[in-house]
Amino acid sequence: MKKIPRIGVGGPVGSGKTAIIEAVVPILIKLGYRILVITNDIVTTEDAKHVQRTLKGVLIEDRIVGVETGGCPHTAVREDPSMNLAAVEEMEAKFPDTDLVLLESGGDNLTLTFSPALIDFFIYVIDVAAGDKIPRKNGPGISQSDILVINKTDLAPYVGASLQVMDDDSRMMRGKKPFVFTNCKTNEGIDDLVHLIRENVLFDTEVSKESA
């Protein structure tokens, strides 16, 4: 069976992890990729149901599954990812034609990381509403994720946050690692995020042609 790349999508509660997934999946599907989505919640499968409703007619429900972790979000994706590994392996066996798995963690804090046994690539999502100080607070999600997503840019004027400060601090904390500003209501930055996924995870040769 082919090795299917897996992206872990993590971040604090309410940062927009589910919205990011719901924004990128239709674009990836339109480009011809076959996707699986696995979400984590502590005592429900609400995120999975939300994705199923939002992507109805775009991604069949059977390709979206929720995992009830019953405990700390980071435990289920880092210290003991066995439930998620079982879910991923079951879904990959059911849909062997899959090109990409998107695995959303439960909402956690800036220390969230994923077990390398579970994912190949890490996207960390923060939101502007939490304040422009978040990037300089650092943490593994800020500095070590493969892509940092700074979501909800439209809220900056309402919370007194400076996008320029967040940009400067993200560059300082991440060095050359990519980050992208997004607004899921307008799709601002979503094409850029999809481009990074195609280039760095799916190794799509068409991306370099498009950039030329």
UniProtKB/Swiss-Prot annotation:
Gene3D superfamilies the UniProt entry points to: P-loop containing nucleotide triphosphate hydrolases (3.40.50.300)
Locations listed in the record: Cytoplasm
Residues binding GTP, per UniProt: 11-18
A single GO cellular-component term on record: cytoplasm
Assembly and interaction partners: Homodimer. UreD, UreF and UreG form a complex that acts as a GTP-hydrolysis-dependent molecular chaperone, activating the urease apoprotein by helping to assemble the nickel containing metallocenter of UreC. The UreE protein probably delivers the nickel.
Protein name: Urease accessory protein UreG 2
Domain of life: Bacteria
Main subcellular location: cytoplasm
Family assignment from sequence similarity: Belongs to the SIMIBI class G3E GTPase family. UreG subfamily.
